[in-house]
C-alpha cells in the first residue's frame, strides 16, 4: 500500500555527516517537448573541490563537490518540487541536509513553472509538473545513478504549487469551481493572480486538470512512494 506523509517530515540521521556531491543533468522528455534541468545532491567522500551553492540574501548556501562520485548503495531517493516561479534552489536547504544524512536528492527547474517562465496561464496548466516528476523518477531509475538509490524508498516533497503536485501524485484533484467560489467570497491575492487565466481556460484544459490522476500510473505503481506537501520556508 502506498505510504503518504502529509503532516510532517521526520529526517533520518546517521552517526556521521557525509560530504555532499552535486551533479548537473538535463533530461529531455521528447514526447512532451520538455527539458528539465536538474541538480542532484548526494553523499560523497570527496571534499577537495568543494564550493558554495544556492547562497542568497535570505539563506546560507551549502558546500558541495561538483561532479564528485556518489558513495554508498540503496540510498533513499528524494524528489524536490518547487512552487510558482521557484527553482531548484528553493528547497536546497532541505536537500543538502538530506544528502549529508545519506540520501540521494533530485531538485529541478520545472519548465513553465520556474523562475522567469511562470505565468498565471502556464501555472494553471498544472498537470505537467506531476508528469515531470514521474518522468524524472523513471530517468533516475534507468540511469547510472540507479546503482546508488533504493527504488523502493522514494519520497516526493513539494512546496506551494509543488505541494499540490505531491498531493496530485496521491490522487488529489484541483476543484476549479470550488476555487472560483472561494475567490468570489474572499479577497485573496492568489485570486487576483489567476483571475483572468481561470476565465480563459478551455473546457479541454479543465478536463486535463480534473483528470491529472490518470496520467500518473507510473508513480502510482510504486508501492513505496511517499509524498510530502509543505507550505513553509522558501527562498528564490
Regions found by a protein language model. Give the residues of each.
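Gly/Ala-rich beta-loop-alpha elbow adjacent to hydrolase catalytic centers
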Residues: 158-162, 166
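Alpha/beta-hydrolase active-site loop
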Residues: 122-147, 151, 168, 173, ...
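Residue in the alpha/beta-hydrolase core beta-strand immediately N-terminal to the catalytic nucleophile
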Residues: 153-155, 227-229
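Catalytic nucleophile-loop/oxyanion-hole region of alpha/beta-hydrolase
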Residues: 85-97, 114-135, 147
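Short amphipathic alpha-helix adjacent to the substrate-entry channel of hydrolases
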Residues: 70-74, 86-109
Amino acid at each position: 500500500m502506498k505510504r503518504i506523509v502529509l503532516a510532517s517530515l521526520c529526517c533520518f540521521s546517521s552517526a556521521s555527516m557525509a560530504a555532499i556531491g552535486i551533479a548537473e543533468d538535463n533530461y529531455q522528455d521528447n514526447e512532451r517537448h520538455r527539458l528539465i534541468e536538474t541538480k542532484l545532491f548526494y553523499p560523497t567522500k570527496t571534499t577537495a573541490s568543494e564550493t558554495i551553492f544556492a547562497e542568497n540574501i535570505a539563506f546560507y548556501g551549502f558546500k558541495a563537490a561538483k561532479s564528485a562520485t556518489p558513495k554508498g548503495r540503496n540510498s533513499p531517493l528524494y524528489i524536490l518540487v518547487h512552487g510558482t516561479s521557484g527553482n531548484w534552489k528553493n528547497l536546497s536547504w532541505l536537500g543538502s541536509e538530506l544528502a549529508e544524512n545519506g540520501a540521494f536528492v533530485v531538485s529541478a527547474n520545472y519548465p513553465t513553472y520556474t523562475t522567469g517562465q511562470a505565468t498565471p496561464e502556464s501555472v494553471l496548466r498544472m498537470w505537467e509538473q506531476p508528469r515531470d516528476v514521474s518522468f524524472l523518477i523513471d530517468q533516475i531509475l534507468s540511469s547510472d545513478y540507479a546503482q546508488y538509490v533504493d527504488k523502493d524508498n522514494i519520497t516526493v516533497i513539494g512546496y506551494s504549487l509543488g505541494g499540490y503536485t505531491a498531493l496530485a501524485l496521491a490522487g488529489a484533484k484541483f476543484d476549479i469551481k470550488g476555487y472560483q467560489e472561494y475567490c468570489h467570497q474572499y479577497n485573496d491575492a492568489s485570486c487576483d493572480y489567476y483571475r483572468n487565466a481561470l476565465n480563459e481556460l478551455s473546457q479541454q484544459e479543465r478536463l486535463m486538470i480534473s483528470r491529472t490522476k490518470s496520467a500518473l500510473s507510473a508513480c502510482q505503481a510504486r508501492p513505496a512512494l511517499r509524498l510530502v506537501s509543505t507550505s513553509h520556508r522558501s527562498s528564490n
